[in-house]
């Protein structure tokens, strides 16, 4: 079998259906793929000989009767997913069946390092994760690398980032591939996390899905009509750089003015609180030796008046922006970053009210909203999933 797992279109079709609906019977594969029984049987036989599939006596997820269910063989191999940011690196090992085999993280000030130092640190971390995964069954299939900015996935180049200075046109995939001797896929945070949510958190992959990331940046990962949306230059979903209406537009690290990220992301709410504290506003935050966005959200959840005011204003802007994306894309499922929940149930409900009042009734009635779990490795998982997805394509 070739480095990819699907050297023919038929094998790719069968593998992707098994990925999405496993454990699944041959008859259900015929219904799902539109292939003939003979074509499905030949494909399954080929993939079974290569030990890419396993077959168990299970209740089929697509049929009520008990039958033999086909699934991807987790022991065939594994993928690494690595996400880096201004404050550190995280890595995860997922097998072919999306089972988590291990994870590591390191806190390091990447934001304060030079470009060459960052590249070396990321490549070295990748090598350490690979070494830590050697005991996993099968072989390492490759690495999915998740960058906090805008990327050119085709060339494996980090184009720019509002969160990392001097991070322009960096051939980071080549550096990691050379260090580890493996194929590397590069993708942005938004698309990585929507893939992570779609495969790791939802009961079944969604047909139309939005994932809203909220942290140092703000991004929107999209899956529409069953396909992940990356845009013509792989930079779709930059929700944080939507211009918001404000009388005093703040400068954004992207070079623009009035970006949502500059007014409502975690660093922005920290800055707002610091300005208010400097003007002698009362708050439980006034005695903090250092202040971060999570602390502001948690203070708001404890009904601190300053934190609550700042967070509600930020969520007003974020909720309005989310509603705009919902109006344009009409998704079935909207998943919100679990970080929103740190502000407490009352402010979380305020965010939902903002989204609802700015959304068309027909769109709202069709929408299922949930909050993501607090798994810090969600982006890493999406990177590993993306790497495996690429191997299932013809």
Go through each PLM region and give its residues:
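Short glycine-aspartate micro-motif
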Residues: 79-83, 91, 140-144, 209-213, ...
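Glycine-rich phosphate-binding loop and adjoining helix at the ATP-binding site
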Residues: 100-208, 346-357
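Glycine/GP-enriched mid-protein hinge/lid loop-to-helix segment characteristic of carbohydrate kinases
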Residues: 103-105, 112-118, 167-168, 172-301
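Short beta-strand/turn micro-motifs composed of small residues
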Residues: 147, 213, 338
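Short, active-site-adjacent cap segments at secondary-structure transitions
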Residues: 150-153, 191-194, 219-220, 229, ...
């Amino acid at each position: 079998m070739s480095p990819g797992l699907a050297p023919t279109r038929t094998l790719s079709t069968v593998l992707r259906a098994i990925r999405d609906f496993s454990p699944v019977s041959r008859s259900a594969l015929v219904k799902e793929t539109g292939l003939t029984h003979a074509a499905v049987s030949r494909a399954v036989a080929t993939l079974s000989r290569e030990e890419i599939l396993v077959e168990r006596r299970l209740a089929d997820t697509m049929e009520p009767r008990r039958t033999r269910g086909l699934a991807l063989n987790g022991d065939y191999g594994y993928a690494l997913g690595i996400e880096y940011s201004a404050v550190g690196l995280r890595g995860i090992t997922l097998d072919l069946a999306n089972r988590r085999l291990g994870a590591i993280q390191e806190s390091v000030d990447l934001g304060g390092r030079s470009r060459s130092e960052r590249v070396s640190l990321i490549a070295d971390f990748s090598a350490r994760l690979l070494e830590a995964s050697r005991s996993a069954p099968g072989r390492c299939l490759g690495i999915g690398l998740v960058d906090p900015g805008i990327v050119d996935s085709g060339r494996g180049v980090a184009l720019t980032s509002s969160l990392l200075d001097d991070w322009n046109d960096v051939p980071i995939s080549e550096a990691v591939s050379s260090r580890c001797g493996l194929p590397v896929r590069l993708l942005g945070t938004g698309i990585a996390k929507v893939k992570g949510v779609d495969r790791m958190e939802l009961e079944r992959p969604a047909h139309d899905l939005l994932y809203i990331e909220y942290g140092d940046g703000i991004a929107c990962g999209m899956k529409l009509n069953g396909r992940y949306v990356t845009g013509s230059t792989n930079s779709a979903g930059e929700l944080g750089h939507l211009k918001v209406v404000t009388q005093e537009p703040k400068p954004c690290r992207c070079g623009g003015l009035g970006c949502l990220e500059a007014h409502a992301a975690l660093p922005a709410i920290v800055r707002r609180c610091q300005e208010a504290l400097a003007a002698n506003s009362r708050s439980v935050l006034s005695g903090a030796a250092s202040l971060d966005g999570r602390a502001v959200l948690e203070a708001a959840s404890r009904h601190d008046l300053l934190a609550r005011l700042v967070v509600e204003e930020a969520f007003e802007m974020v909720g309005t922006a989310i509603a705009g994306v919902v109006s344009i894309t009409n998704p079935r499922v909207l998943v919100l970053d679990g970080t929103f929940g740190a502000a407490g149930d009352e402010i979380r409900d305020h965010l939902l009210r903002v989204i609802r009042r700015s959304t068309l009734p027909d769109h709202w009635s069709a929408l299922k909203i949930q909050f993501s779990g607090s798994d810090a490795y969600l982006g890493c998982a999406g990177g590993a999933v993306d790497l495996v997805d690429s191997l299932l394509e013809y």
